[in-house]
Design a protein with these regions (language model features):
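Short, ordered, surface-exposed loop/turn motifs in non-cytosolic proteins
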Residues: 21, 28-43
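A short, amphipathic beta-strand motif
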Residues: 21-27, 54, 90
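Short, acidic, small-residue-rich periplasmic hinge/interaction motif at the N-terminus
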Residues: 26, 70-73, 85-134
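Short Pro-Gly-centered beta-turn/loop motif in secreted/extracellular proteins
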Residues: 31-35, 57-64
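A short, solvent-exposed loop/turn motif at the edges and junctions
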Residues: 41-43, 65-78
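Short, acidic Ser/Thr/Gly-rich low-complexity loop/linker segments typical of extracellular
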Residues: 45-55
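Structured extracytoplasmic
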Residues: 108-280, 286-294, 356-457, 461-464, ...
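Exposed, low-structure sequence patches enriched in small/polar residues
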Residues: 251-253, 375, 385-849
């Protein structure tokens, strides 16, 4: 989507008001910029500060003294007059300043926490948190208004002189000065949410009721445009400094008043001053290592017994290891309520971003206001149900009167005119052709009309290869909710040019709840019938992507064990808002071995293999699965639904029953599987993802119905799969697997000279598989030599030693060029097997902050 604006929008601007003084604050001796310099008029309680790059902007007041102060520098006061320029370069002289036996200077010196008054004060502030926590009340509630604006940032005024740009008055009218950074921006989307937030102490429960939602902007131009708002909301979440850890940019940041703050940050007392008539201690802080994921900023602490935060400013250190973020600024203000307590009422955030320096820059502005705090009893009926977030049925259909009453922050002129801007943009000459191409690239589908009833795709499955078909072509399509909001059809026709075979898939979906575009939108409540005839590798089922994806068609080993399958499946899926998903399936399937795979019963041992008939099996089964993941969030693409937030745990439990004699089923069997996934954050040491799985095949079955490892045969990294296990290499009827991955987030590299400038991130992993095959399913035992149920194992399939789990180790470097992840994989054991490959390199392209 960003490329769309690079192609269409030249950076645009308009002149700033002459009633503002702006400039930069620098060190007199070194010329370095001085971040977070206090900027205020004398005798004025309002405190401003320069940003992380030393830039400042403040209202012009002729005849008053403007004061600049920073830790370790001599305070400077300047009389503002008519001749004072609008652009200023302020130089501050370094000094050594003693604060109650603690020396603070601009030169690097040893920081001591012992006998440090700033540290002692912060210990008292942290200890006082529990006393002032609103959750001490039995009940409380408040209203919240939040506005999210996404815009092109830092537009160059010189480019307005371009003749083509001058002709686009509708575009020039959309440009405005951002009040937070005084740069010219071009707003592209705005999202508003009004909610009521409820809290009950006993039994503890919290609810967020979404009363109103309003979204307009470039996300309306593409059907999966909700991805933009969903990702922005998850990345730039609400910040509560009273939490020990603050989740931001999908990472945990140590709060400056969290339990670990004393060890993580360095604190300095700046001054004692008044903020809105309240006497406050003014402190500054920064991380011990500025490349760690932490904040730099200022705190204003009430100089009374509450020691509550009155105001805070948070930003990222200049040397931060965070990707794509040029500047982040958070300003929060707390207000005293009628009962004397303090509550958060203002929470503003701006994030200035760029993928690479020479490309278009962007800004996200999140404006939040909390109001109407109340502590009266809330009726129990308001807390019914397990869903934490409840949507008013009419939340997206609120009228202007609702927004006039609940919009506590006015829209800017550009935000108000967003609809007309998008309309003008969509009617620009050549725009439709560019949009068509970009949508096909971004969404992997081609729409067949402006309001598409049928989409063609996925595009990346149209051409692929495999061992049986050689070259394979495929044409796929799916209907959308524009045709029927409750009923969906999809399918494909494929041709294998070497095998001369034709393949198909047809799917009918009925959704009990109305959908906006695709049937898998949350919550999914559907009945689905699918009929498929195709060819596959047994390991294909472990891949989250389409098996015909051209990018995963390149394998590190020859995949010649394959089978044709003819499958009919009826499924019912029902998701609850609070995270529980129930799935019931009925399936009948016939598999015919092909390639180097044979389904040969032991009772036919010694018979000659007929290349035209390598064996078939048919199964009929019913399965039941429960999946629970509280707080999980998603984005919808045209191909599938993707997780956004990986912090919530995931629990799954399933059981499958095979029935002989029903719809031609040849076998009775019972398969039980369970899994747990959990992410653990280690503060500045990154995160550890742990996935544990286990399963049992309870009955005697032929090898196609045994449990095979989740083998990833491509060069592309896929989560929770084994990279060096071959196709069907191990066959078990009992197994347990453990997948542990540790993303150190640059903790070690950031402390190595030169390497730390690359901003690489370390990644370690270990994957273990324990498996066993009970005697009843072991075809190599003499007692099973003529068993009519069991089959000979394929060549290259082996039995594991139950006392020796398979282990592979992974060491990787992530964040290469902020995009490329490279992993080296080493197979620790079972290397004497003919199919074993000891080492491998896997890659992945993934953008992370």
């Amino acid at each position: 989507m960003k490329k769309l604006f690079i192609l269409l929008l030249l950076t645009l601007t308009q002149t700033l008001s002459a009633q503002v003084i702006k400039g930069i604050v620098v060190d007199e001796e070194t010329g370095d910029t001085i971040p977070y310099t206090g900027v205020q008029y004398k005798n004025d309680n309002k405190v401003n500060a320069s940003d992380s790059h030393g830039r400042f902007s403040i209202e012009r007041r002729n005849g008053e003294y403007l004061t600049f102060s920073a830790v370790g520098y001599t305070t400077l006061s300047i009389l503002i007059g008519p001749n004072t320029p609008d652009e200023m370069r302020i130089t501050l002289k370094p000094e050594t300043k003693r604060l109650k036996e603690v020396t603070v200077s601009t030169k690097r010196s040893k920081y001591s926490r012992k006998n440090n008054p700033a540290v002692e004060l912060m210990k008292r502030v942290i200890a006082a948190k529990k006393r002032t926590d609103l959750s001490n009340h039995d009940y409380y509630q408040f209203n919240k208004y939040q506005k999210l604006t996404f815009a092109i940032n830092d537009i160059n005024p010189l480019q307005l002189e371009n003749e083509k740009t001058k002709k686009k008055q509708w575009m020039l009218n959309q440009i405005e000065v951002c009040q937070y950074n005084n740069k010219l921006i071009l707003p592209l989307s705005v999202d508003e949410t009004v909610s009521q937030n409820l809290y009950r102490k006993d039994p503890k429960n919290e609810k967020t009721i979404i009363l109103g939602q309003n979204t307009t902007g470039v996300n309306d131009l593409i059907q999966t445009g909700d991805i933009l708002n969903t990702v922005i909301k998850d990345v730039f979440t609400d910040v509560d400094i009273y939490d020990d850890q603050i989740r931001l940019l999908q990472y945990p940041f140590t709060s400056p008043i969290g339990k670990d703050a004393i060890d993580f940050y360095r604190f300095y007392i700046v001054d004692t001053l008044y903020v809105d008539e309240d006497k406050c201690f003014h402190l500054q802080f920064l991380p011990n290592n500025q490349q760690d994921f932490g904040f730099r900023g200022e705190l204003w602490i009430l100089a009374d017994s509450t020691l509550h935060v009155k105001k805070c400013k948070l930003s990222l250190p200049k040397k931060t290891d965070v990707n794509f973020t040029d500047n982040l600024s958070i300003v929060q203000e707390y207000t005293q309520l009628p009962n004397g307590e303090w509550a958060l009422t203002t929470d503003d955030m701006i994030v200035e971003m760029s993928v690479v320096k020479f490309m278009t820059k962007f800004i996200v502005i999140r404006t939040t206001r909390m109001s109407n705090y109340a502590f009266n009893k809330i009726p129990d009926k308001e807390f019914k149900g397990k869903a934490k977030i409840i949507y008013d049925p009419n939340s997206k259909m609120k009228d202007d009167d609702f927004w006039a009453a609940n919009r506590t922050v006015h829209l800017t002129n550009s935000e108000r005119s967003m609809g007309s801007f998008i309309n003008s943009l969509s009617h620009t000459k050549g725009f439709k052709i560019i949009l068509f191409g970009l949508k096909a690239l971004i969404e992997n589908y081609v729409e067949t009309s402006k309001k598409s009833y049928v989409d063609i795709g996925p595009i990346n499955t149209m051409i692929s290869t495999n061992f049986i078909d050689g070259l394979r072509t495929r044409l796929s399509a799916q209907t959308t909710a524009h045709l029927f909001p409750h009923f969906f059809m999809s399918g494909y026709y494929a041709r294998g040019w070497d095998s001369k075979k034709n393949y198909y898939k047809g799917q009918l979906v009925y959704s009990f709840n109305k959908k906006e575009y695709m049937p898998w939108e949350f919550p999914k409540r559907t009945i689905t019938f699918t009929s498929t005839y195709d060819v596959c590798s047994p390991s294909d089922k472990f891949m989250p992507t389409d098996k015909d994806n051209v990018f995963t068609a390149f394998k590190w080993t020859e995949v010649n064990k394959m089978m044709f399958y003819n499958r009919q499946e009826l499924s019912f899926e029902y998701e609850q808002y609070w995270g529980l998903k129930t799935t019931i399936k009925l399936k009948t399937e016939e598999n015919e071995a092909c390639g180097s795979l044979f389904f040969k019963p032991l009772s036919l041992n010694g018979a000659t293999n007929d290349a035209m008939s390598q064996g078939r099996i048919r199964t009929t089964e019913a399965s039941f699965q429960l999946r629970y993941s509280p707080g999980e969030t998603y984005v919808n693409t045209k191909q599938r639904r993707l997780r956004v937030n990986f912090d919530p745990p995931v629990f799954t439990l399933s059981h499958t029953v095979g029935v002989k004699g029903v719809l031609g089923g040849d076998y009775n069997y019972n398969l039980t599987e369970a899994s747990i996934y959990k992410r653990f954050w280690l503060n500045s040491w990154g995160k550890i993802d742990v996935a544990v799985k286990g399963g049992v095949q309870w009955n005697k079955v032929p090898f196609p119905l045994l449990i095979m490892p989740a083998a990833n045969l491509s060069y592309i990294v896929e989560d929770e799969t084994f990279n060096l296990i071959n196709n069907m290499e191990f066959l078990n009827d009992r197994y347990a697997s453990l997948d542990i991955s540790w993303d150190l987030n640059g903790k070690i590299f950031n402390r190595i000279p030169l390497i730390k400038k690359l901003k690489w991130r370390e990644w370690l992993g270990v994957r273990c598989l324990w498996g066993t095959l009970t005697d009843k399913n072991n075809p190599t035992l003499q007692r099973n030599a003529d068993d009519p149920l069991l089959m000979q194992f394929p060549e290259g399939s082996y039995i594991m030693d139950p006392k020796r789990p398979y282990i592979e180790l992974v060491a990787g470097i992530h964040n290469i060029f902020k995009l490329l992840h490279v992993q080296f994989v080493h197979r620790l054991n079972y290397n004497s097997l003919p199919t074993a490959k000891r080492n491998g390199v896997r890659i992945m392209l993934r953008l992370t902050f």
